[in-house]
Structures are given as structure tokens and as C-alpha cells.
Amino acid sequence: MFTEGDKFNQTVVETDLEQAVDVACRNAQDCCHSKSFTCFTRRMRAVSAARLPHVVLLAVFEYLNLKDLARCMRVCKHWLTVLQYPDSFVWRRLARTVIPDEALNDFSLLSEIPSFKDKLRAFCYAWNPNDSSKNNYLRPNGFTVHRNPVAQSTDSVRGKIGVNSGIHAWEFTWEGPLGTVACIGLATKHAALHCQGYVALLGSDDQSWGWNLVDNQLLHNSKPISPYPHINNPPKYQMGERIRMIVDCEQHSMYFEKGSEFLGIAFSRLPPLKLFPAMCAVYGNTEVSMVYIGPPLLG
């Protein structure tokens, strides 16, 4: 039986899983003829949900959505173990259901995300079409934002999920000309997403922190902080290059990497607020892809 802290509502379990359990039992019996499966042909209540065999749990989990699977992973160690394998058919089926085909078929876009479970997580952290300037739109792949050619306008977009704990990494790729302003960085939920003229909107107030890839300037509170990377004559960003942004909420800092090259600390003393990945652009028809790759490899 479950402990008090981990106890899963048995009534909910039986209600949610009863329709699927018959199918699961038949599939399990086709795979294995052990006597231990015969109890499922009678009544669900004869077996604790925490002791169901892996093959039965996988067959049942196949019918659940992402939110329910996340809850199941917190029920007990047995269920967590079943769902930990990142390329099981449960995650594969859900990924093919949730993530657009345009993204799954673009091997370059998700090349750093090998497993289906991590692809699902990346999609959950992608650009938010409902938290964007009206002059942007999200491409069908769900990971790439396109800025429409609107004159005298600076347009921004935030990611779906903000962070205020742990260490997180996103990868940005800028396709198309940069124009005079092309910033990537962080923003609170209060940061502006649109303004008139061509300005570095990301970093224009105390609610955002930006790196302008055009002139290699760090920006915050409407002030240029310093050139970045912190070297003489830093190289210009080349269209299509992948830039990784790492946010360390424990150290309240942010830094960037290009390939295996550490570019140095960009911002320190970040506030303990929920911060969202963001970008701002001014050039018409430019596109920016953002992929969440989880905690970075440290070493």
C-alpha cells in the first residue's frame, strides 16, 4: 500500500484506469502466460495499483495525457521506474500526438534532443504564441517564431515556462538577417513585448536582460553594460549559428556558450523572480528558433 505522502487516490485510479485495464490485461496475457496475470481477468481491486507488472502499467499509461503521466511519476518508485525510460512507446506515442510533425521531421531542429521524453519537455518550454507581439507568429513546428515585415517596430516573444530554481539551458538559432537589433536573453512577465522604432527592447528596462548579437552589447535597464564576450573585438554572430543560454537560478547568473566554448558570465545578481527566455527582433521575415535542452552538462 502507499504511504500517506505518496498515496494515490484509489477511487480515481480505478475510475481512470478501469476502461483501459481490460485491454491491458489482454495485451499482457498475449505477451506472458504467467499465472500472476490471471487475477486481472477477475477484478481490479484484487491487486494493488502499486504492484502492477510493468507490461500492464505501460499499456495503461498509453491512454494518459502528459499532465496525468507527470502525476503518475510522483505516485511511487515503481511507477516512476516504469516511466523513466525516455524512449518507451508511451513517450513515443505521446510525442507523436503532441509535437507537430514539422518539428519531429526536422532532424536539425531537435538534433540535440535524442529522446521522445526530452522532445516533449522541449515543446513544453518552446515559444509562447499567446505571449508575443502581434507582429510575430509561430511557425507550424512550434519552435520557430517569425517576425512579419512591419516598419518602425520592435517585436518580442517569451517562452511558455519561466524558471526561478535549478539550472536550465536553451539553444537559439537566428535564421535571416539580424538588422540593427537582434537580442536574446531573459524577461519577467512584466517586460514589454512591442515598441515603436528600432530599439533593443530586451534590456530596455529593469524587467529584462538582453544580449544584442548585432553589436555584442549586454543590455539592462536601458543601459549598455559591457561588450560580450569579454574580449577585444569579439566575433560577430553568423546567421544559423547555435547559441546556448544557461540560466543558473541558484547562483542568480546567466551565461552563453557557442559549441563547446564558454563565453563568460553575461549577467549576475539576477533577481529571484520567475524569468522567461525571450528575444526581440526588428528585421522583417527573420526567424528565431528556441529549443530547451534541460540542465546543461557541467564539468
Curated annotation (Swiss-Prot):
GO biological process, one term: negative regulation of apoptotic process
PROSITE patterns per UniProt: B302_SPRY, FBOX
Gene Ontology MF: a single term: protease binding
Subcellular location: Synapse
Domain B30.2/SPRY: 105-297
F-box domain mapped to chain residues: 46-94
Domain of life: Eukaryota
Self-association and partners: Component of a SCF (SKP1-CUL1-F-box protein) E3 ubiquitin ligase complex.
Homology family: Belongs to the FBXO45/Fsn family.
Entry protein name: F-box/SPRY domain-containing protein 1
Originating species: Brugia malayi
